[in-house]
Protein backbone atom coordinates (compact mmCIF):
# COMPACT_ATOMS: atom_id res chain seq x y z
CA UNK A 1 0.00 0.00 0.00
CA UNK A 2 2.84 2.39 0.84
CA UNK A 3 4.41 1.82 -2.57
CA UNK A 4 1.04 2.18 -4.29
CA UNK A 5 0.44 5.48 -2.51
CA UNK A 6 4.06 6.54 -3.12
CA UNK A 7 4.72 7.03 0.58
CA UNK A 8 7.93 6.16 2.36
CA UNK A 9 7.30 4.08 5.47
CA UNK A 10 9.62 2.37 7.90
CA UNK A 11 7.77 -0.85 8.76
CA UNK A 12 9.04 -2.58 11.89
CA UNK A 13 7.98 -5.77 13.62
CA UNK A 14 8.20 -5.83 17.41
CA UNK A 15 6.44 -6.81 20.61
CA UNK A 16 3.48 -4.46 21.25
CA UNK A 17 3.97 -4.96 24.98
CA UNK A 18 7.67 -3.97 24.91
CA UNK A 19 8.29 -1.34 22.24
CA UNK A 20 11.84 -0.30 21.37
CA UNK A 21 10.87 3.30 20.55
CA UNK A 22 11.96 6.25 22.66
CA UNK A 23 9.50 7.90 25.06
CA UNK A 24 7.15 10.44 23.47
CA UNK A 25 8.07 9.50 19.88
CA UNK A 26 4.65 9.58 18.19
CA UNK A 27 1.70 11.89 17.65
CA UNK A 28 -0.63 8.94 16.93
CA UNK A 29 -0.70 5.24 17.82
CA UNK A 30 -3.17 3.05 15.91
CA UNK A 31 -4.12 -0.55 16.66
CA UNK A 32 -6.65 -2.78 14.90
CA UNK A 33 -7.71 -6.23 16.11
CA UNK A 34 -4.56 -6.62 18.17
CA UNK A 35 -5.34 -5.87 21.81
CA UNK A 36 -7.52 -8.97 22.28
CA UNK A 37 -4.60 -11.23 21.22
CA UNK A 38 -2.07 -9.93 23.74
CA UNK A 39 -1.02 -11.94 26.80
CA UNK A 40 -0.52 -8.69 28.78
CA UNK A 41 -2.81 -6.12 27.17
CA UNK A 42 -2.47 -3.74 30.13
CA UNK A 43 1.28 -3.62 29.47
CA UNK A 44 0.60 -2.72 25.83
CA UNK A 45 -1.57 0.22 26.89
CA UNK A 46 1.23 1.35 29.20
CA UNK A 47 3.73 1.16 26.33
CA UNK A 48 1.46 2.92 23.86
CA UNK A 49 1.01 5.77 26.33
CA UNK A 50 4.77 5.91 26.92
CA UNK A 51 5.60 6.37 23.22
CA UNK A 52 2.86 8.96 22.65
CA UNK A 53 3.78 12.62 22.86
CA UNK A 54 1.76 14.72 25.33
CA UNK A 55 -1.57 15.45 23.64
CA UNK A 56 -0.99 12.49 21.28
CA UNK A 57 -3.88 10.35 20.07
CA UNK A 58 -4.43 6.62 20.58
CA UNK A 59 -6.90 4.92 18.24
CA UNK A 60 -7.73 1.30 19.03
CA UNK A 61 -10.17 -0.72 16.92
CA UNK A 62 -11.00 -4.02 18.59
CA UNK A 63 -13.85 -6.21 19.88
CA UNK A 64 -14.81 -8.22 22.94
CA UNK A 65 -13.73 -11.47 21.29
CA UNK A 66 -13.47 -13.15 24.69
CA UNK A 67 -17.26 -13.35 24.76
CA UNK A 68 -17.34 -15.13 21.37
CA UNK A 69 -17.00 -18.88 20.87
CA UNK A 70 -14.68 -19.25 17.87
CA UNK A 71 -15.53 -22.93 17.50
CA UNK A 72 -19.19 -22.05 16.82
CA UNK A 73 -19.35 -21.11 13.13
CA UNK A 74 -22.94 -22.07 12.27
CA UNK A 75 -24.07 -18.42 12.31
CA UNK A 76 -21.45 -17.37 9.76
CA UNK A 77 -22.12 -17.08 6.02
CA UNK A 78 -21.26 -20.25 4.08
CA UNK A 79 -18.37 -18.55 2.27
CA UNK A 80 -16.89 -17.07 5.47
CA UNK A 81 -13.14 -17.49 5.87
CA UNK A 82 -13.50 -19.26 9.25
CA UNK A 83 -15.55 -22.03 7.62
CA UNK A 84 -12.55 -22.86 5.45
CA UNK A 85 -10.27 -23.47 8.45
CA UNK A 86 -11.94 -26.59 9.83
CA UNK A 87 -13.40 -27.38 13.24
CA UNK A 88 -10.17 -28.55 14.88
CA UNK A 89 -8.27 -25.37 14.04
CA UNK A 90 -11.15 -23.17 15.18
CA UNK A 91 -11.32 -25.15 18.45
CA UNK A 92 -7.57 -24.66 18.90
CA UNK A 93 -8.05 -20.91 18.40
CA UNK A 94 -10.83 -20.97 20.98
CA UNK A 95 -8.63 -22.83 23.48
CA UNK A 96 -5.76 -20.37 23.05
CA UNK A 97 -8.08 -17.37 23.36
CA UNK A 98 -9.53 -18.71 26.62
CA UNK A 99 -6.02 -18.66 28.13
CA UNK A 100 -5.63 -14.91 27.55
CA UNK A 101 -6.57 -12.80 30.60
CA UNK A 102 -8.23 -10.16 28.41
CA UNK A 103 -10.78 -12.76 27.27
CA UNK A 104 -12.38 -12.65 30.72
CA UNK A 105 -12.74 -8.86 30.84
CA UNK A 106 -15.83 -6.87 29.97
CA UNK A 107 -14.71 -4.75 27.07
CA UNK A 108 -14.46 -1.90 26.25
CA UNK A 109 -15.12 -0.95 29.90
CA UNK A 110 -11.86 -2.65 30.90
CA UNK A 111 -9.98 -0.69 28.22
CA UNK A 112 -11.32 2.63 29.48
CA UNK A 113 -10.20 1.79 33.02
CA UNK A 114 -6.71 0.77 31.86
CA UNK A 115 -6.31 3.87 29.71
CA UNK A 116 -7.22 6.05 32.67
CA UNK A 117 -4.39 4.44 34.65
CA UNK A 118 -1.93 5.41 31.92
CA UNK A 119 -2.23 9.19 31.63
CA UNK A 120 -4.92 8.99 28.95
CA UNK A 121 -7.88 11.37 28.92
CA UNK A 122 -10.73 12.48 26.67
CA UNK A 123 -11.52 8.79 26.21
CA UNK A 124 -14.38 8.08 23.83
CA UNK A 125 -15.91 4.80 22.68
CA UNK A 126 -17.70 4.18 19.38
CA UNK A 127 -19.87 1.07 19.70
CA UNK A 128 -21.45 1.48 16.25
CA UNK A 129 -18.34 0.66 14.24
CA UNK A 130 -19.44 -2.77 12.97
CA UNK A 131 -22.67 -1.43 11.51
CA UNK A 132 -20.66 0.94 9.34
CA UNK A 133 -17.86 -1.48 8.41
CA UNK A 134 -19.87 -4.65 7.75
CA UNK A 135 -22.67 -3.62 5.42
CA UNK A 136 -23.12 -7.21 4.18
CA UNK A 137 -22.48 -10.72 5.49
CA UNK A 138 -19.66 -11.75 3.16
CA UNK A 139 -16.51 -13.84 3.74
CA UNK A 140 -15.04 -11.02 5.83
CA UNK A 141 -18.12 -10.49 8.00
CA UNK A 142 -17.41 -10.42 11.73
CA UNK A 143 -20.41 -11.16 13.98
CA UNK A 144 -18.60 -9.88 17.09
CA UNK A 145 -19.39 -6.15 17.37
CA UNK A 146 -16.26 -4.06 16.99
CA UNK A 147 -15.64 -0.86 18.90
CA UNK A 148 -13.31 2.07 18.43
CA UNK A 149 -11.53 3.78 21.30
CA UNK A 150 -10.01 7.24 20.97
CA UNK A 151 -7.95 8.70 23.82
CA UNK A 152 -5.46 11.53 24.25
CA UNK A 153 -2.34 11.45 26.35
CA UNK A 154 -2.41 14.12 29.02
CA UNK A 155 -0.51 17.27 28.13
CA UNK A 156 2.43 18.38 30.22
CA UNK A 157 0.85 21.77 30.90
Model-derived segments and spans:
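Class I SAM-dependent methyltransferase SAM/SAH-binding core
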Residues: 1-18
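A short acidic, Gly/Pro-enriched loop at the edge of an enzyme's catalytic core
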Residues: 14-29
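A short SAM/SAH-binding and catalytic strip from SAM-dependent methyltransferases
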Residues: 28-42
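A short glycine-rich, Lys/Arg-flanked "PGG" loop and its adjoining helix->strand segment in the class I
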Residues: 42-57
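Conserved class I S-adenosyl-L-methionine
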Residues: 57-89
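Short glycine/proline- and acidic residue-enriched helix-loop micro-motifs
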Residues: 90-102
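Short alpha-helix
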Residues: 101-126
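Core SAM-dependent methyltransferase catalytic element
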Residues: 118-119, 128, 135-157
Amino acid sequence: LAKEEQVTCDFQVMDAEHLTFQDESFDVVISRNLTWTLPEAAQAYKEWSRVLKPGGLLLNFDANYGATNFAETSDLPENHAHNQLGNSLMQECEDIKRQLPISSYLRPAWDVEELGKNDMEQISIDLGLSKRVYKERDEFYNPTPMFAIAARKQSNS
